[in-house]
C-alpha cells in the first residue's frame, strides 16, 4: 500500500510540474466541458432574461435581480411546444384577445421552503410568482403556468420596499414594459396565421400573509383585518357599536359588509402616503398622529410598493383583481380546521378511536388511495399534545380535504346524537356544506357565478350556527374572509386557489434542494424551472386524455381505444374507482376513446338505502354496463364494502 501511495504522489507531482502534460490537458477539457454544460443549463433562461436593480433598505449597494420577461417567456414556451401552441390557438378561436377585449391573466405568488416539511431551513425560503390565462382550457394544469420570477425571501425582505416593490416591478414589466401584455401583446403564429394577444390582470391570488407583504396591508391582526371590506373591524375593538356602518369580524350578515371600491382603496393609500410625507419630510404631524392614520386606514406606507406606484394606477387594476384563497381560509389552520377540532372535542372522540375508524378498508379514488390510507396519521401520537390529546387538528390542506367527509360520516354513524351535541353537529355540518359547494364549483359541476348567492347564504348560515353554539371566542379574521369568495365568483365564474400554486412549487423544489452556491441564485433557480417546463411540455396532452398507454378494445372495434386511467376535468379517474353520474353510482371498468370522444365503461350500482344525508348504500355486481361521457362522471370521496 505504501508503494502504491508513493507512486500516485509522484505521478501527481509530475502532472502539476508539467502544465503541458496530457493529464492537465484532460483537466482543461473537463473545465471546458463544465463551462459548456453550465452555459447549456442557463441558455433558455438567458434568452428571455432581464435585470432589475433594487436598493437595499438598511445597507449600501444594490441587488441585481435576474428575471424572465413574462411575454418573452410565453413566446419561448410556444416555440418549444406544438401542443401548447395548439392550446393557445384553440383559446383564440373562442376569445380573440384583442386590445379592446383582452384575455384575463391570473397571477399567483407564495413563499415556500425547499426540503422536507419536518426538516426545513427558513433561510432558504423562496418567493415565487406564477401566471396563466383564464381562457386556456389547461389553466388548472401546471404546463399552462409560467414562472417569471423567483427570489430568496430573505433577499426580497431586505430590499427597499420589500416584496411589495418586487411585485410592483413585475406588474409593470408584465403589462407596461417593452414586451407588455397590455402595450404590445404576445405575437402568436399558428398554421400561417399571425395574431397579437393582449391581456389584463384579472386575478391576483395569494394568502393573507402574501397580501400583507405584497401590498403593505397591515394584516389580519390589525384594526382593519379585511382588505376587501373596509367597514370590518377587529374582534372586541369596542368601535363597531359606536361607529355607524362598521361591523366586526364576527359579522354573519353579508348585507352589512361594505365592499371596498377602487376609489376608496386609492384614497386610503393617498392618505397614508400624505401622512408619511408630513411626518418624515415636513415633521408637520406627530408620530402618534401618523400611527393613528395607519391604523384607521389599515395600510402601511411602502416606498416603491405596488399600492404607491403611480405608474400602475389607472393602468393595472391589481386591487379589483385581489382573490382570497379559499384553501388557506378553510384548510390551512383555517375555518374548517377549527370547526373539526371543536366537534371532536364536543363529541369526546378519542384519538385511538378515530385512528381505528380511518384505518378501516376505505376505498378512495385511485390517485388518492395512498394518501387516503394514511389519514389515520392525523391522530397518531406524534401529532397529539404531551397528554396524548388532540388539542388541534394538525393536518395539511390535502389531508384535511380528505378527512372532513370521513369525519362527517363518523359523527353521523358512530356518535350517539344527544340534544347537547346537536348545536355542535349543526355548526360542523354547515361548515362542511360550504366546502362541498366550493369543491363542486371548482370541479365545474356548478357555475360559480350562478352559485354565488347560494354560497353567501351557506356562509351566513354557518356563521350564525357557529355563534349560537360557541359564541365568538373561536372566530378569527378568516371567518369574515369567507364573504369575499362569493364576490369573486360573480366576477370570474371560476374558482382559483393555492392548490395550483403548490403544484407549481414542485417545479422549483428540485433545483432549490440541490442548490449549494448562493451566487446568482435566482438565475440558477429560474433556469432549472424553465428547463423542467420545456421538458414537461413535450408530453403535454389535451384537457381530457389517457394517462397510460391505450390499447385496442377489440379486434371488432379497431378504432376504439381503452386504458386504465384518464384525466377528466382535472380529475384522475382509474379503473376500479367508484364514480357518480348525477344521482347514480357505479364502478369504472375501462376508460374509452371512440370517435374522438372519451367515455367511461361503468358497471352501474343499484340504490339500496340512504344511510345519512351524505352517504348511500348500493348493491354492486349488477351486470348493468353503461358507456358514460367522461365529462358526466364525478368521483366519490370514499367508499366502503
Please name every model-derived segment.
Residues 122-186, 239-287, 291, 594-641:
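E2/UBC-UEV (E2-variant) core
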Residues 101-105, 125-129, 222, 497, ...:
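Core residues of folded domains in eukaryotic genome-function proteins
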Residues 78-99, 103, 112-162, 516, ...:
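Catalytic-core region of right-hand nucleic acid polymerases
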Residues 106-108, 113, 130-132, 227, ...:
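Beta-strand cores of modular interaction/reader domains in eukaryotic scaffold and signaling proteins
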Amino acid at each position: 500500500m505504501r508503494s502504491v501511495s508513493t507512486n500516485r504522489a509522484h505521478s501527481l507531482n509530475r502532472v502539476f510540474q508539467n502544465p503541458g502534460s496530457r493529464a492537465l490537458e484532460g483537466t482543461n477539457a473537463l473545465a471546458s466541458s463544465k463551462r459548456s454544460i453550465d452555459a447549456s443549463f442557463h441558455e433558455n433562461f438567458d434568452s428571455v432574461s432581464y435585470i432589475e436593480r433594487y436598493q437595499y433598505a438598511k445597507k449600501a449597494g444594490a441587488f441585481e435581480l435576474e428575471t424572465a420577461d413574462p411575454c418573452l417567456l410565453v413566446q419561448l414556451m410556444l416555440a418549444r411546444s406544438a401542443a401548447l401552441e395548439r392550446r393557445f390557438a384553440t383559446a383564440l378561436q373562442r376569445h380573440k384577445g384583442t386590445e379592446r377585449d383582452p384575455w384575463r391573466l391570473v397571477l399567483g405568488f407564495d413563499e415556500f421552503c425547499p426540503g422536507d416539511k419536518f426538516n426545513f431551513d427558513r433561510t432558504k425560503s423562496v418567493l415565487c410568482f406564477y401566471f396563466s390565462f383564464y381562457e386556456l382550457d389547461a389553466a388548472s394544469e401546471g404546463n399552462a403556468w409560467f414562472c417569471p420570477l423567483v427570489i430568496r425571501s430573505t433577499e426580497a425582505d431586505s430590499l427597499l420596499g420589500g416584496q411589495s416593490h418586487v411585485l410592483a416591478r413585475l406588474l409593470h414589466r408584465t403589462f407596461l414594459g417593452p414586451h407588455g401584455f397590455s402595450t404590445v401583446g404576445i405575437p402568436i403564429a399558428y398554421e400561417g396565421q399571425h395574431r397579437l394577444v393582449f391581456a389584463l390582470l384579472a386575478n391576483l391570488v395569494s394568502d393573507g400573509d402574501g397580501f400583507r407583504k405584497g401590498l403593505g396591508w397591515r394584516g389580519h391582526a390589525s384594526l382593519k383585518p379585511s382588505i376587501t371590506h373596509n367597514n370590518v373591524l377587529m374582534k372586541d375593538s369596542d368601535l363597531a357599536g359606536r361607529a355607524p356602518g362598521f361591523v366586526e369580524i364576527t359579522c354573519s350578515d353579508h348585507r352589512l359588509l361594505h365592499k371596498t371600491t377602487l376609489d376608496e382603496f386609492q384614497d386610503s393609500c393617498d392618505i397614508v402616503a400624505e401622512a408619511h410625507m408630513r411626518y418624515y419630510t415636513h415633521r408637520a404631524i406627530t408620530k402618534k398622529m401618523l400611527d393613528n392614520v395607519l391604523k384607521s386606514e389599515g395600510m402601511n406606507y411602502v416606498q416603491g410598493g405596488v399600492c404607491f406606484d403611480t405608474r400602475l394606477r389607472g393602468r393595472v387594476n391589481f386591487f379589483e383583481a385581489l382573490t382570497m384563497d379559499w384553501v388557506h381560509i378553510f384548510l390551512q389552520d383555517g375555518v374548517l380546521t377549527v370547526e373539526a377540532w371543536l366537534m371532536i372535542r364536543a363529541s369526546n372522540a378519542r384519538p385511538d378511536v378515530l385512528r381505528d375508524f380511518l384505518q378501516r378498508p376505505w376505498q378512495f379514488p385511485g390517485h388518492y388511495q395512498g394518501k387516503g390510507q394514511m389519514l389515520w396519521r392525523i391522530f397518531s401520537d406524534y401529532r397529539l399534545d404531551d397528554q396524548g390529546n388532540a388539542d388541534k387538528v394538525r393536518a395539511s390542506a390535502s389531508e384535511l380535504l380528505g378527512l372532513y367527509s370521513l369525519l362527517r360520516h363518523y359523527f353521523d354513524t358512530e356518535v350517539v346524537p344527544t340534544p347537547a351535541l346537536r348545536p355542535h353537529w349543526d355548526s360542523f355540518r354547515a361548515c362542511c356544506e360550504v366546502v362541498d359547494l366550493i369543491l363542486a364549483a371548482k370541479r365545474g359541476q356548478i357555475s360559480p357565478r350562478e352559485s354565488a348567492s347560494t354560497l353567501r347564504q351557506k356562509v351566513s348560515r354557518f356563521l350564525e350556527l357557529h355563534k349560537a353554539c360557541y359564541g365568538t371566542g373561536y372566530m378569527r379574521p378568516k371567518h369574515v374572509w369567507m364573504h369575499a369568495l362569493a364576490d369573486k365568483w360573480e366576477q370570474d365564474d371560476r374558482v382559483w386557489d393555492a392548490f395550483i400554486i403548490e403544484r407549481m412549487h414542485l417545479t422549483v423544489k428540485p433545483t432549490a434542494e440541490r442548490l449549494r452556491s448562493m451566487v446568482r441564485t435566482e438565475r440558477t433557480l429560474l433556469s432549472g424551472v424553465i428547463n423542467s417546463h420545456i421538458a414537461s411540455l413535450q408530453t403535454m396532452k389535451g384537457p381530457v386524455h389517457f394517462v397510460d398507454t391505450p390499447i385496442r378494445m377489440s379486434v371488432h372495434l379497431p378504432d376504439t381505444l381503452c386504458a386504465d386511467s384518464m384525466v377528466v376535468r382535472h380529475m384522475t379517474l382509474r379503473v376500479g374507482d367508484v364514480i357518480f353520474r348525477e344521482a347514480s353510482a357505479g364502478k369504472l371498468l375501462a376508460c374509452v376513446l371512440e370517435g374522438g370522444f372519451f367515455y367511461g365503461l361503468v358497471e352501474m350500482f343499484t340504490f339500496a338505502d340512504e344511510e345519512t344525508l351524505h352517504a348511500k348504500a348500493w348493491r354492486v355486481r349488477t351486470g348493468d354496463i353503461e358507456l358514460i361521457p367522461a365529462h358526466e362522471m364525478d368521483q366519490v370521496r370514499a367508499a366502503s364494502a
